[in-house]
């Protein structure tokens, strides 16, 4: 339940909107990261301070589920997100529910999120802020997300995501 609840909560945080689904795969990957993050946090918190003393034994189960999920994703050999994304961007834009691939992306996103969770998750609330139902390239989608974030820490997270995908934005090209 925790895993699915965190995933659906991720959609709420991201401001999910019906409409153009071209970049929905990215939101699905963020929501997968939210689930993995929630499992880790519950494992840590419940090992020290469970809601009920007899629930403390569940703490390692959350961590185990997270590990099993990540290890079950079996990355392709020498997986590099930026080059893999360039080769698979059309397939992703056509099918947001490629669960194994969403997991691969989520694990890479999680490595950034866990460095500074608060601004990372708060940045997600701006992900679909400028959605207008029109089709956007992934580069435009991320650029709009960056522009919508009002705080420096949020922008830093989005910039790290942009870099993770090896994307140059118009601002980079003008430097």
Where are each of the predicted segments found?
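An acidic intrinsically disordered interaction segment
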Residues: 1-5, 61-80
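Hydrophobic alpha-helical segments and helix-packing faces
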Residues: 2, 24-27, 102
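Active-site recognition of the HExxH zinc-binding catalytic motif
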Residues: 3-19, 28, 32, 36
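Generic structural signal for well-ordered, non-membrane alpha-helices
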Residues: 7-11, 40, 104-107, 111
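Active-site catalytic microenvironments for nucleophilic, acid-base chemistry
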Residues: 16, 37-41, 112-115
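Second-shell loop/turn segments in exported
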Residues: 16-25, 94-96
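Post-HExxH zinc-binding segment in Zn-dependent metallohydrolases
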Residues: 24-71
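Pan-zinc metallopeptidase signature
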Residues: 72-175
